[in-house]
A protein has these predicted regions:
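Extended alpha-helical targeting/anchoring segments
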Residues: 1-87, 122-147, 180-240, 244-531
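A cross-taxon signal for low-complexity, glycine/charged-rich
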Residues: 90-122, 152-165, 171-173, 177-180, ...
Length: 531
């Protein structure tokens, strides 16, 4: 057990996170900004945990040294979370009365009451320090996806019948070449000092895990001074970095012809009964050197989403405007999953927009696409949740974003007392909305047709908190930025009644806000979709 306490201080003055992050962290590596309209968190890693599934290589680094182990990352995380269990919270009195009683609810945040003039008994938000980062899609090799417990088709052995048993079950990388060494299969920061922004109440908290109050106070004082020196210069922002003279080219891993051919191949497997639904995706790249933070700020303005995020891993970064929640765990052990299946573009007039949204979920295809994945998520949660606790609380809800309407269902369940977020993650990963169903068979077909690793795309990112809570988003609508290259994925669910050309256009529709943000940031006069 660690002899640490959680110290937090509520500041009397509000600061906009879009001003704070560039001022405190723009010139630093290993930083994060989990960012949305209700709660945001930002800070810098005190440790970095990287993992490769090909040889079970786990590395743990801080500023002074790197420790290398042969250990499964889930085993490591189980031990770490257990060792931090029971860390007490210590609040530093604020300079003014607390706001009136309210209950906050946020994609990234928590839900705890605060009374007028009362001292807080704990932070209002769920993240109290812990792990921030991602698990890439290929981490499925160490989850229940590669166990026959992961799902059944109407045939006795969906893995055998999908003709890709080696790809989806036997080989740890699902038949693919090894991932880019610069991008681990999983990469997490350990975070013990961070800022938490409550956007609803315009409150800013400084939070520190420390063995003594003096160390926490020193960090509070230093950070408060930096915040007090902020100017208004960051409030105005030129989204265009520079004029990009050459035509900007976006290149997919599958051409239009190949993607449509793969859709038809998926449908053959579906008709044979090897699967019910397959999520086929495409990877798109652009060779360009660009300021990652400038691009992220362009993306968050153009395509605001429940799970915006910027995570700088040093030699690459994750820039996300993900709309989809994978898994959330609250302080009472309640799990929420919100699979997103069913998409339609926005209308160019209000009347047309409402009509398109109204139709979503009412067609047989949209309904089937969503409900199949709801059943899959219920099955995944059933491995780890209390019997009888799993409920579909909000089926087939239409949610609207900048470029699309999406069909979302909400499933809840209660974790069994002997389980935690790591058990849940291994039971449910990868998210069924990005595989299809049955999960094992769908993963095998995906491996056969896509032929390249998905990498970070279609995995999950977010936080695992030391207090047992977690919030993880699906890694979609997300740019992975290298020093001189950008990449992102897009795709959709294939059913027997899918129209191949329409599925291809839906893939492009989902890629549109990412392409638009890149073009806007570069100031490119022309761009080419090399599809």
């Amino acid at each position: 057990m660690h002899n640490y306490r959680l110290y937090y201080k509520k500041l009397s003055r509000w600061h906009d996170p879009e001003q704070v992050f560039p001022a405190l962290y723009a010139d630093k590596k290993y930083t994060f900004w989990l960012d949305n309209k209700d709660f945001s968190y930002m800070g810098i890693a005190s440790k970095r945990i990287k993992y490769s599934i090909s040889n079970h290589a786990l590395s743990i680094s801080d500023n002074n040294k790197t420790q290398k182990l042969r250990q499964n990352i889930f085993t490591y995380l189980q031990k770490e979370l257990l060792s931090w269990k029971g860390v007490a919270s210590v609040g530093i009195p604020v300079e003014r009365p607390q706001p009136p009683l309210r209950r906050s609810q946020s994609p990234w945040g928590g839900s705890e009451d605060v009374g007028l003039g009362k001292r807080e008994t704990g932070p209002l938000f769920n993240f109290t320090g812990g792990f921030v980062g991602y698990f890439g899609y290929e981490m499925k090799a160490e989850c229940d996806c590669l166990s026959l417990r992961g799902g059944q088709s109407r045939r006795s052995n969906p893995v055998k019948n999908c003709k890709t048993q080696r790809d989806c079950h036997a080989h740890p990388l699902s038949g693919f070449a090894r991932n880019d060494k610069k991008k681990p299969d999983a990469y997490l920061f350990f975070v013990d000092k961070f800022l938490a922004f409550d956007h609803q109440q315009k409150c800013l908290y400084l939070v520190a895990l420390s063995e003594n109050k003096k160390e926490a106070d020193q960090w509070f004082s230093a950070t408060t001074i930096k915040l007090s020196n902020l100017t208004s210069n960051f409030s105005t922002f030129d989204f265009r970095l520079s004029t990009f003279d050459s035509p900007l080219t976006f290149t997919p891993s599958q051409s239009r012809q190949q993607y449509i051919k793969n859709i038809r191949t998926c449908q053959k497997y579906l008709i044979q009964g090897d699967a019910y639904q397959i999520c086929l995706t495409n990877q798109i790249t652009a060779d360009i050197k660009i300021d990652w933070l400038v691009l992220y700020r362009t993306l968050r303005a153009a395509n605001p989403a429940p799970f915006n995020a910027y995570i700088n891993f040093g030699n690459f970064a994750l820039l996300s405007s993900s709309p989809e929640q994978f898994l959330q765990v609250d302080k009472e052990g309640w799990v929420t999953g919100k699979p997103m299946k069913g998409t339609v573009r926005r209308g160019d007039t209000r009347k047309k927009d409402l009509r398109l949204a109204g139709r979503l979920g009412k067609t047989e295809k949209d309904y089937a696409e969503n409900i199949m994945i709801v059943d899959l998520v219920r099955n995944d949660l059933g491995k780890i949740c209390e019997f009888g606790s799993i409920k579909v609380t909000k089926p087939l809800e239409v949610q609207t974003y900048a470029t699309v309407h999406q069909l979302v269902s909400t499933i809840k369940g209660k974790l069994r007392p002997e389980t935690n977020i790591i058990d849940l993650l291994q039971a449910a990963f990868p998210g069924g909305s990005m595989t299809g169903t049955p999960k094992i068979a769908a993963c095998g077909i995906i491996a056969e047709l896509e032929k390249t690793p998905r990498g970070i795309y279609s995995g999950t990112f977010g936080f695992l908190s030391l207090n047992g809570t977690a919030n993880l988003a699906m890694t979609i609508r997300t740019i992975i930025a290298d020093k001189e290259k950008l990449s992102f994925g897009a795709g959709g669910a294939i059913l027997t009644d899918s129209v191949p050309q329409e599925e291809y256009e839906e893939m492009l529709l989902k890629a549109q806000p990412l392409i638009t943000s890149i073009v806007k940031t570069t100031g490119a006069k022309t761009f080419h979709l090399n599809f």
